[in-house]
Amino acid sequence: MMCAPAVDPVTMAAVVKQESGGQPWVVNNNTTRKSTAFASKAAAVAAAVAVVGRGESVDMGLAQINSKNLPALGLTVEQVFDPCTNLAAGANILAAGYARADSLGGALSMYNTGRSDSKIGAAYTQKVFGQAGVQVPAIPGGQLAKLPELVVASSFATNPAAMAAVRLTVTPSPFAAGLSPVKAAFQPASWR
């Protein structure tokens, strides 16, 4: 995506698919939890301006840029509905998260919640990975080992099978990729 060169196209596309379903005129009012996909840019801008004018938090456009981040991004509500500008803003937020979290999962969590260690952010990360066709499979057998077998060394002597290596197979999509390690100066309002 030429609009968002700091982020791998597959990663950015997965974020967009999760955030807006690829619809450029989506307005999500975080206060009322109501999301609307408008038929035109003008209608989306008018709705978002009204919501922001009431002091409510709203996510806008393809990458669902939050209204609280507009000042730091130097954007107006109207500008954020330009698809390329919206993608560039989303990429800046994601790259800034990557610079802080130093992992794609942490960056995605920060993109969604402002924190790299959030349970909600972790669930969001899995959804974005799923949009890109990446799924981490379950460990074969599907049961957790008892903690004493993992911690107490003497149990290995009495149960050599407990020491057998577990091979975890991760099957990523051939189209999935991470972020380019580009640092960005932008810090969303929720990270301060």
Q: Model-flagged regions — what are they?
A:
Residues 1-5, 133-192:
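N-terminal secretory targeting signals
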Residues 1-138:
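Catalytic glycan-binding domains that act on GlcNAc-containing polysaccharides
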